[in-house]
Curated annotation (Swiss-Prot):
Component of the CENPA-CAD complex, composed of CENPI, CENPK, CENPL, CENPO, CENPP, CENPQ, CENPR and CENPS. The CENPA-CAD complex interacts with the CENPA-NAC complex, at least composed of CENPA, CENPC, CENPH, CENPM, CENPN, CENPT and CENPU. Interacts with SENP6. It is found in: Nucleus; Chromosome, Centromere. The keyword Kinase does not apply. It comes from Mus musculus (Mouse). This is Centromere protein I. Keywords: Centromere, Chromosome, Nucleus, Ubl conjugation. InterPro entries: CENP-I (IPR012485). Residues 1-24 are annotated as: Disordered. Sumoylated. Sumoylated form can be polyubiquitinated by RNF4, leading to its degradation. Desumoylation by SENP6 prevents its degradation. Component of the CENPA-CAD (nucleosome distal) complex, a complex recruited to centromeres which is involved in assembly of kinetochore proteins, mitotic progression and chromosome segregation. May be involved in incorporation of newly synthesized CENPA into centromeres via its interaction with the CENPA-NAC complex. Required for the localization of CENPF, MAD1L1 and MAD2 (MAD2L1 or MAD2L2) to kinetochores. Involved in the response of gonadal tissues to follicle-stimulating hormone.
Length: 746
């Protein structure tokens, strides 16, 4: 590796000596480019030199003088004694904070800071003001890394450089050569001081081909030496994600925050520069160049400014635009700005290069199609990492009493939700955002967005998700309106569907006969069952609070309509019934659609149960996969109760005693028939309408006349009115051996 590094450094020096063709630019070249107007200036990109003011000219000149001083200045100087040094350093800081620095200026100042030409205090201040105006050249980073090899700078300067490199990672125009230095960065893990920041950088650089057995062993040795450090767990978790067979130690299934970014020196400053250059702020912001006390920058939220524009990583400024045919006939990558239509994506998919700022793909449906095709896990990891910073570090709307920017933030969340729906995958960073902000949520602001984020929580053990639901969401659920309760139940139904889709896909990818997967699948089924049971508990409490509301019961049965078909629709060995309170509330409901939906759910439960019993695999599987006899008895009880009530007019079990005085108070003596399909409270209007349709001249005909042939005609009438659930239930559960009710059913 040393030979490769020397060769690379010599090649870089040759490129520097070539002048205009080099990306590494000397101060003289930079000044010439500034005067010619063909390249970016130090302050900002300007299309016309004539429109610049005298103040801008003076600032540009002062910055050029300051950068020239640092490039050729004294090797050692003291800030307290050298006023010229302080003056030039202040100039660089002011320009960096107001408009950012051009790539050429960053290239020069990085070399100054890491070459050890000045003291630690000066080097630290230079690194803290390395805020890019647009992008950072990859060659500048490579040259800076080469200074680390000769050990010219102090340990504190190295730490600050790695922190800067992580913060500015998405601003680097190329990363191919930086990725080739993966081994060098990995070797730097030996330094205990650098280890957390190098782990963070490696987390951003790691791809599947970087995961090697010797690196896994090294990380495990470091963990044994240093303990369960979050940064080591992050890298090990990523390695296990790419190569699960190489790591057998137990790791946290999901840690909400691996890296602490709350003391990032450059994030808010670089964002403010970008917003100002885009016209979001009329005046420069006064931002400190030192760690803050944890308070985020209170700025106007603008989702269009937070998500950077889509720019190619390999775009060269001033390059003549080429046609699509030119890129297809060569090995060059197609600039993303030329990608406008889906046919172009299909034609150029082999020569497409994703942007360096990966978060910019959120605004591009075409690139989201591309991400879905390539299935590169590192892409989703980079997007999730950026979302983690954007949601956890910069979103302060939920902990301050200021909702003026709620609309802009809602638009941003809607965009994130649309991306998750398109990719059919939830981001862990969004779940971490829910854990952080849900305790402060009032249940009203961004309600739709919050509940949609809840529906996209990635699959995990229910014990990890339950605190989010029981500790924070349940109190809001119980104390809010019925409409909020219905919305939460809808979100839990979508969450269940997303989990089932993920599990069914994963189960088909790997064979279910291997013992390790059986254990995993058994735990997964347990998590799904616990989610259904917890939702059932919420439903029972909500029914009591809302006095068995029909609207609420509709949403509850919609949820169990999804539950009853799990085995057939998703091929997962699980059958979970609704609680008795839900069953009896639906059976005795005054709404005919509720009764019809209950009949359909019971019919689907029967089909799933029958299919599960016929499955040979379940019969030979371990006990954790066998269908519970308790569930079987419970289903038979529900089935018997429905048939007895709706068909045989025997709603009570033998041996059940009811006080006759209580029956008399109900106003009816034929209590046994009060719940059949003729006298059921939800079907009385249909029975009366049927009699009027059959015998319009006899206005006094009694409901008891519906028997014999009329009974069958009445059933056909109900089926014609849309009671398909009732039709399926009767045809599947009621047989000819069951006697039809006679005129006197007492």
């Amino acid at each position: 590796m040393a030979t490769q590094r020397v060769t690379r450094n010599s090649q870089q020096q040759n490129r520097i000596s070539q002048g205009s063709n080099s990306r590494q630019t000397s101060l003289l070249d930079w000044m010439v480019k500034d005067k010619s107007g063909n390249f970016k200036s130090v302050l900002k990109e300007s299309s016309s030199v004539e429109d610049s003011t005298r103040t801008d000219d003076r600032t540009e000149g002062a910055l050029q003088v300051a950068v020239g001083y640092f490039q050729k200045g004294p090797k050692k100087a003291s800030l307290s004694k050298d006023k010229v040094l302080e003056k030039h350093l202040t100039t660089v800081e002011n320009v960096a904070l107001s408009n950012g620095l051009a790539p050429e200026a960053i290239d020069i100042l990085l070399n100054v800071a890491l070459s050890g030409k000045f003291g630690n205090a000066v080097n630290s201040r230079i690194l803290k003001c390395m805020i890019p105006e647009s992008h950072i050249s990859e060659d500048s980073v490579l040259k800076a890394v080469s200074w680390l090899c000769v050990d010219k700078c102090s340990g504190n300067t190295k730490v600050l450089f790695y922190r800067w490199l992580v913060a500015m990672f998405d601003f680097i125009d190329h990363k191919k050569q930086i990725s080739s230095l993966y081994g060098f960065f990995f070797a730097s893990l030996q330094d205990d001081t650098l280890c957390p920041y190098v782990c963070h950088l490696l987390y951003l650089l790691t791809k599947r081909e970087n995961v090697k057995p010797f690196r896994v062993r090294k990380l495990l040795d470091l963990q044994a030496k240093m303990g369960m450090q979050p940064h080591l767990q992050a890298l090990l978790s990523l390695y296990k994600f790419f190569a699960p067979t190489l790591i057998s130690v137990s790791l946290p299934v999901r840690k909400k925050i691996f890296f602490n970014n709350s003391k990032n020196l450059w994030t808010s400053a670089s964002l403010a520069v970008r917003l100002r250059n885009q016209g979001a702020f009329p005046e420069p912001l006064n931002l400190p160049l030192r760690p803050t006390t944890g308070r985020s920058l209170k700025r106007k939220w603008n989702s269009h400014s937070v998500i950077p524009a889509l720019n190619s990583a390999n775009k060269e400024y001033g390059e003549k635009t080429a046609s699509l045919f030119d890129y297809l006939s060569s090995e060059r990558s197609l600039p993303l700005e030329q990608l406008q239509r889906f046919p172009q994506l299909l034609e150029s998919i082999h020569c497409l290069e994703l942007p360096s700022q990966m978060c910019s793909v959120l605004n591009s449906p075409l690139l989201l199609h591309y991400i879905n095709c390539v299935k590169d896990e590192s892409i989703l990891l980079r997007i999730s990492y950026w979302l983690s910073q954007a949601l956890q570090e910069e979103c302060v709307w939920y902990n301050i009493n200021n909702y003026e920017q709620e609309k802009e933030f809602i638009n941003f969340l809607d965009l994130v939700i649309r991306v998750q729906c398109f990719l059919q995958e939830g981001f862990y960073s969004c779940e971490a955002f829910l854990y952080k902000s849900l305790p402060l949520w009032d249940g009203s602001s961004c309600r739709s967005q919050y509940l949609q984020l809840l529906a996209w929580i990635p699959f995990s053990s229910f014990s990890e998700v339950k605190p989010l639901l029981s500790d924070h969401l349940a109190p809001l659920f119980f104390t809010s309106s019925i409409y909020f309760k219905c919305s939460v139940l809808q979100s839990l139904q979508e969450l269940l569907q997303n989990w089932l889709l993920w599990l069914s896909t994963d189960a088909h990818v790997q064979p279910t006969t291997d013992s390790p997967l059986e254990t995993t699948l058994g735990g997964s089924m347990s998590s799904v069952s616990q989610l259904i049971e917890y939702t059932g508990w919420l439903c029972v409490v909500a029914m009591r609070l809302e006095s068995s509301s029909t609207l609420l019961l509709h949403f509850i049965l919609d949820f169990y309509e999804k539950v009853c078909d799990i085995y057939i629709n998703y091929d997962l060995p699980i059958v979970v019934l609704f609680p008795p309170v839900i069953f009896h509330s639906a059976l005795l409901s005054l709404d005919a659609t509720i009764l019809n939906q209950l009949c359909y759910i019971m019919y689907r439960y029967r089909n799933n149960w029958t299919a599960a019993k016929k499955n040979r695999y379940l019969q030979k599987a371990k006990p954790e996969f066998s269908l519970s006899s308790k569930i079987c008895k419970e289903y038979n009880y529900y089935l018997t109760a429905m048939v007895c009530c709706l068909w045989t007019s025997r709603p009570f079990k033998a041996g059940v005693y009811t006080d006759p005085e209580t029956i008399e108070n109900t106003g009816g003596t034929q209590y046994k028939s009060t719940l059949n399909i003729v006298y059921h409270p939800s079907l009385l209007s249909y029975a009366a309408s049927f009699l009027l349709q059959e015998s319009p001249e006899e206005m006094t005909e009694h409901l008891s006349s519906i028997q014999g042939k009329k009974w069958n005609w009445y059933l056909d009438y109900l089926y014609s009115e849309g009671f398909q659930g009732l039709k399926l239930f009767i045809k599947s559960s009621v047989h000819s051996s069951v006697p039809k009710p006679e005129e006197n059913t007492e």
